[in-house]
A protein has these predicted regions:
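Generic structural signal for hydrophobic residues
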Residues: 26-27, 69
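A broad detector of short, well-ordered amphipathic alpha-helices
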Residues: 28-29, 64
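Flexible acidic/glycine-rich loop/turn elements at helix↔coil and beta-strand↔loop transitions
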Residues: 29-36
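Conserved AMP-binding/adenylate-forming core of the ANL superfamily
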Residues: 17-19, 36-95
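Flexible, non-catalytic linker and terminal segments flanking ANL/adenylate-forming cores
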Residues: 1-25, 43-45
Length: 96
């Protein structure tokens, strides 16, 4: 899904703000170069929001979780270009 005009995309690329890496490509890059660094962390009150303990995920753990979610979506028949809705509180899973 593309949400920006062709003119804006060209402008941002020309300025160097946007490149060719996808969001998952950037995650994969950080997982390869900084595998054990903290990528995402829940806020301390996660238990109040979900009943679960706060999560802290390294870039490698986030990359694996992202791959797992992608596999589950493909298994459910969701493919590239399909629009989906995500509704979650402000928790680590929101970035997967």
């Amino acid at each position: 899904m593309i949400t920006s005009s062709a003119q804006r995309i060209a402008d941002y690329r020309q300025r160097g703000w946007w490149g060719d890496l996808t969001l998952h490509g950037m995650l994969r890059h950080h997982a390869a170069n900084n595998p054990h660094l903290l990528a995402v962390a829940d806020q301390p009150n996660r238990h109040a929001l979900t009943g679960d303990a706060p999560l802290r995920l390294s870039f490698t753990e986030l990359d694996h979780a992202s791959d797992n979610l992608a596999s589950q979506l493909l298994h459910a028949g969701i493919t590239s270009g399909d629009a989906i809705l995500v509704q979650l509180p402000n928790i680590a899973e929101l970035v997967m």
